[in-house]
């Protein structure tokens, strides 16, 4: 909720233009169905991961940093959207399980990409990887334990 509200608040105040958000992330924000929004955001994270790989191969550090930030923002939007549904992941697992599987796959791909990097370049993805791991763990915990009442 916090990340989505922050983005929406910054957009409303005009501090961040909608043009500064990646096009796919804007499309995800425009989606009213929160479950679908989380899926679109995770799809965008996958696209950003591919962009990060391409940027690294081209030795384009600014594009790599932007892609890492986009991964982090996309994953946060997905998590915030699922949290905003107010649903218990254990009782209504559809979007939560789908997100858990997708974050697990993204983690594997991100880890593989990070291992392909030279040792000195690896910290670029640390923040995105940590956020992705946290969201995955929270999703898994929600599915296994359910929400506290």
Q: PLM ranges: what are they?
A:
Residues 11-19:
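Hydrophobic h-region of N-terminal signal peptides that target proteins for export
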Residues 1-9:
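Bacterial N-terminal signal peptides that target proteins for export
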Residues 19-149:
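Long, charged/polar, soluble alpha-helical segments
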């Amino acid at each position: 909720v916090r990340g989505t509200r922050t983005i929406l608040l910054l957009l409303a105040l005009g501090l961040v233009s909608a043009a500064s958000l990646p096009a796919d992330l804007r499309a995800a924000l425009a989606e009213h169905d929160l479950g679908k929004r989380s899926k679109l955001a995770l799809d965008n994270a996958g696209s950003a991961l591919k962009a990060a790989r391409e940027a690294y191969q081209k030795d384009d550090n600014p594009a790599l940093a932007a892609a890492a930030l986009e991964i982090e923002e996309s994953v946060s939007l997905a998590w915030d959207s699922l949290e905003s549904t107010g649903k218990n992941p254990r009782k209504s697992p559809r979007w939560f399980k789908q997100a858990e599987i997708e974050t697990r796959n993204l983690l594997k791909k991100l880890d593989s990409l990070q291992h392909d990097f030279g040792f000195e370049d690896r910290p670029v993805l640390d923040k995105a990887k940590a956020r992705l791991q946290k969201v995955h763990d929270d999703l898994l915990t929600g599915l296994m334990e359910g929400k506290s009442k």
